């Protein structure tokens, strides 16, 4: 699938993102752009060091969300994000992965195959041009987009100083 560029003036651009401090002026997407128009998008996030608790929590939480046509939004990070994307797929739902880098580099590398699947059947989204690699400061910026796309936020586990809690604070 090719890369689409969505300007903030486009009908496809999620209007809730415009309410963010410093909204992205452009989004790069690969996959099913209509997922941006889904009426209910739910962020499912948690620790990169997710335990069996997150696995069990998503087994309980994601099926009813999928049954109600909710799109699962997460960040393709290792741990809870990966579990959320995989659970959405497993239960027949749709998912959006918001990246903290461009499409030419997938981080973590262990999620390259998952990212290819998402680009084909779901949606990858980034505010970064394709050639931009992952940088530490990109991930808090990514988190604001996860929050801005979502109508609700599900957190399974989080360390006291973590990107998950940054996203949660943005949601309050």
Predicted feature residues:
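Glycine-biased, small-residue-rich flexible motifs in mid-sequence functional cores and linkers
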Residues: 7-172
């Amino acid at each position: 699938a090719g890369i689409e560029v969505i300007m903030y003036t486009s009908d496809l651009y999620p209007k809730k993102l415009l309410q963010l401090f410093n909204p992205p002026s452009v989004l790069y997407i690969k996959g099913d752009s209509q997922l941006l128009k889904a009426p209910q998008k739910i962020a499912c996030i948690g620790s990169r060091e997710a335990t069996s608790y997150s696995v069990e929590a998503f087994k309980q939480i994601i099926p009813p969300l999928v049954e109600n046509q909710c799109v699962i939004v997460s960040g393709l990070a290792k741990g809870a994000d990966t579990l959320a994307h995989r659970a959405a797929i497993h239960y027949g739902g749709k998912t959006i992965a918001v990246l903290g880098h461009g499409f030419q580099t997938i981080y973590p590398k262990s999620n390259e195959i998952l990212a290819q699947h998402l680009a084909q059947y779901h949606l990858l989204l980034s505010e970064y041009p394709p050639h931009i690699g992952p940088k530490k400061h990109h991930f808090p910026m990514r988190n604001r987009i996860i929050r801005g796309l979502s109508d609700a936020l599900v957190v399974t586990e989080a360390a006291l100083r973590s990107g998950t809690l940054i996203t949660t604070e943005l949601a309050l």
